Amino acid sequence: MSLVPVVVEQTNRGERSYDIYSRLLKDRIVMLSEEVNDVTASLIVAQLLFLEAENPDKDIYFYINSPGGSITAGMAIYDTMQYIKSDVSTICIGMAASMGAFLLAAGEKGKRFALPNSEIMIHQPLGGFQGQATDIGIHADRILRIKKKLNAIISERTGQSIEKVEKDTERDNFMTAEEAKEYGLIDEVFTKKK
């Protein structure tokens, strides 16, 4: 059972209650606090599109605490972040691993942040396939193409060479918030909200 807090606001028309995520959305805050999958991606994409339609000139604040997940679902979020006119500021709270770290780096340059005790982890895409040898070969080629594409995007987002990104994503690569800043995945470590 999932518990979602309700917030009650006083207005001149009386009281109004919201679930906490709807209330945060009013302040242009989007949360990813679970695995990236088709359902979470659909919700996040819808929120990004809604906020851009509401005011394309105002920033959107995307808070990330995620172990990662589906590459295709994550790429739907990534593409939407790049497509919309609104700047998307990303903030790591807790952990941004795998696709979570990729989305963290996808924020508007200069507006990518992490809290001081956050942890960021990058690695190569994972895949497990079974079936006929020909089909396994097709899937292996696909995952190698995806790996190359993700590494190129990380290289572009961080300023690191493609060779360094390839080496650094060969295995799980955990970083503190400060290390992620040095690497170029984020721009600043927050200790207090500005």
Swiss-Prot record:
Give the signal peptide, or none. Answer: none
Please give the catalytic activity noted in the UniProt record: Hydrolysis of proteins to small peptides in the presence of ATP and magnesium. alpha-casein is the usual test substrate. In the absence of ATP, only oligopeptides shorter than five residues are hydrolyzed (such as succinyl-Leu-Tyr-|-NHMec, and Leu-Tyr-Leu-|-Tyr-Trp, in which cleavage of the -Tyr-|-Leu- and -Tyr-|-Trp bonds also occurs)
Primary localization: cytoplasm
InterPro entries reported for this sequence: ClpP, ClpP/crotonase-like_dom_sf, ClpP/TepA, ClpP_His_AS, ClpP_Ser_AS
Q: What class of enzyme is it?
A: hydrolase
Where are the active-site residues found? 98, 123
Which CDD domains does the record associate with it? S14_ClpP_2 (cd07017)
GO BP terms: protein quality control for misfolded or incompletely synthesized proteins
Keywords, in A-Z order = Cytoplasm, Hydrolase, Protease, Serine protease
What is this enzyme's EC? 3.4.21.92
* Stored PROSITE patterns: CLP_PROTEASE_HIS, CLP_PROTEASE_SER
User: What's one GO-annotated cellular component?
Assistant: endopeptidase Clp complex
Compartments, record wording: Cytoplasm
The record's GO molecular-function terms, alphabetically, read:
ATP-dependent peptidase activity; ATPase binding; serine-type endopeptidase activity
- SUPFAM superfamilies with a match to the protein in the record: ClpP/crotonase
State the Gene3D superfamilies in the record: 2-enoyl-CoA Hydratase, Chain A, domain 1 (3.90.226.10)
State the protein's purpose: Cleaves peptides in various proteins in a process that requires ATP hydrolysis. Has a chymotrypsin-like activity. Plays a major role in the degradation of misfolded proteins.
UniProt-listed NCBIfam families: clpP, PRK00277.1, PRK12553.1
Subunit details? Fourteen ClpP subunits assemble into 2 heptameric rings which stack back to back to give a disk-like structure with a central cavity, resembling the structure of eukaryotic proteasomes.
Q: Which HAMAP family match?
A: ClpP
Q: Which family does it belong to?
A: Belongs to the peptidase S14 family.
Protein name per Swiss-Prot or TrEMBL: ATP-dependent Clp protease proteolytic subunit
